[in-house]
Structure formats: structure tokens, C-alpha cells
A protein has these predicted regions:
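Short, cationic-aromatic polyanion-contact patches
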Residues: 42-49, 65, 98-121
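A short, conserved structural fragment
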Residues: 91-98
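General nucleic-acid-binding
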Residues: 1-24
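Basic amphipathic alpha-helical segments that dock to polyanions
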Residues: 69, 84-91
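Short acidic, hydrophobic short linear motifs in intrinsically disordered regions
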Residues: 63-71
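Short alpha-helical segments that sit at the start of domains
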Residues: 27-53
Length: 121
């Protein structure tokens, strides 16, 4: 099961996590792969949180096109394309090009089964 961890960390904290993991690898300790998206500014994190319903709709309904997703979420296609592009840039979703009913369509796809938030107080 692939789990995505979403967190708010500074660049220094991410680097420390990387060093800790590199030391474990050098010692030969194998861990389960960890997929994490860390935000270093609150604006991007808030944008992610605001658009969780879109991510959830992609995971649950597995739409065959952006247009179908727009109908499911009751959002404008142009606004939805911006959200999808944001998610794709941070690596949360992949957009595949597929042929549906004779037309080339963009199909958003989430590769994770679960999204977890890890927030420090």
C-alpha cells in the first residue's frame, strides 16, 4: 500500500531527514519506501489543503478525463486544470494521455491509497 505523507518542514529539516535515512542505508537497514511531500511555506500547504476534495474525487471516482472530474466536483474545467497542474508539479498525481470515445483526453491518476498529514506543533 502506497501512502503519501504531507508535512510542513523547512529545508534544513528535510536535509536532516535525508542524512538520517542515508546513514541507515549505509548500515544496511532496509525500510519501507516513504513518499512525502513537504511544504516550506504556508501558502502552498493551504492551497493543497483547500483542494483535497479534488484529490479525493480522483482517488474515489477514478475519472476518465478532466471534463468528467469537473462534472463530478461541480468545478470549472479551467480552474480544475490549474489545481491538477499544481498537484502534478508537486508529484501527488500523474496525468496520463488516453483515447476515450475517439478523442485524446487527459486522465488524472493518484498512485497512493492513503494520504496522511504529519504536522509538528
Amino acid at each position: 500500500m502506497k501512502r503519501l505523507i504531507v508535512s510542513c518542514k523547512t529545508a534544513d529539516q528535510v536535509f536532516e531527514d535525508f542524512k538520517r535515512t542515508a546513514k541507515k542505508v549505509q548500515r544496511g537497514v532496509r525500510q519501507e519506501p516513504q513518499y512525502e511531500v513537504s511544504f516550506d511555506n504556508k501558502a502552498d500547504f493551504n492551497r493543497f489543503v483547500r483542494n483535497i476534495p479534488v484529490l479525493s474525487a480522483i482517488m474515489v471516482f477514478k475519472p476518465r478525463s478532466v471534463y468528467e472530474l469537473a462534472k463530478l466536483t461541480h468545478q470549472d474545467v479551467s480552474n480544475l486544470n490549474k489545481v491538477i497542474q499544481f498537484f502534478e508539479e508537486i508529484g501527488v498525481i500523474r496525468v496520463k494521455t488516453a483515447r476515450h470515445a475517439g478523442r485524446m483526453v487527459k486522465q488524472p491518476h493518484v498512485e497512493y491509497n492513503e494520504v496522511t498529514f504529519r504536522l509538528a506543533a
